Curated annotation (Swiss-Prot):
Pathway: tRNA modification; tRNA-queuosine biosynthesis. The keyword Oxidoreductase applies. Belongs to the GTP cyclohydrolase I family. QueF type 1 subfamily. The lineage of its organism: Bacteria, Pseudomonadati, Pseudomonadota, Alphaproteobacteria, Hyphomicrobiales. Pfam families: QueF (PF14489). Substrate binds at V73, E74, S75, H92, E93. The active site is at C51, D58. It is found in: Cytoplasm. GO terms for cellular component: cytoplasm. It comes from Methylocella silvestris (strain DSM 15510 / CIP 108128 / LMG 27833 / NCIMB 13906 / BL2). This is NADPH-dependent 7-cyano-7-deazaguanine reductase.
Length: 153
């Protein structure tokens, strides 16, 4: 399980990159607009992990959308947490769903979804989607904007 810290102790500090998600600390800060229903989006266009079988690198575009409640994620801690997967062997589905579940455990958002758009290995892209359920009524929810992978042409 990822470690949780209230506040922004990593922001503005020289912090060593965690070697694994278990060593990473996701930080949360109070939502200054807790009464408002809004969407926050984080996009990680260069997410990497390792294939658990071959040890070869896997690459993905991650799009994380969430409707905050009492907490918002501190972005530097999220960046370091996502980077901690770089040396972790895990299947695409495991990485994508785990990130979503870890964020839910830390933030307890009104709603969250994650799209993992994995680049092809072996000629086949894998897209993984996970959410906490239906979005709240009235939430402006733009498309994640990632077309299906089709290679050249």
């Amino acid at each position: 399980m990822v470690k949780i810290h209230d506040g922004a102790s990593q922001l503005g500090a020289n912090v060593a990159a965690p070697r694994s998600p278990e060593e990473a600390t996701l930080e949360r800060v109070a939502n200054p607009h807790e009464e408002a229903l809004y969407l926050a989006r984080f996009t990680a266009p260069e997410f990497t992990s390792l294939c658990p079988v071959t040890g070869q690198p896997d690459f993905a575009l991650l799009v994380i959308d969430y409707a905050p409640d009492k907490w918002i994620v501190e972005s530097k801690s999220l960046k370091l947490y996502l980077g901690s997967f770089r040396n972790r062997g895990a299947f695409h589905e495991d990485c994508t769903v785990r990130i979503g579940k870890d964020l839910v455990a830390v933030l307890a958002p009104r709603w969250l979804r994650i799209g993992g758009y994995w680049y092809p290995r072996g000629g086949m892209p894998i897209d993984v989607f996970w959410s906490t359920g239906a979005p709240p009524p009235g939430l402006w929810l733009p498309d994640q904007g990632v077309p299906p992978y089709r290679g050249r042409g």
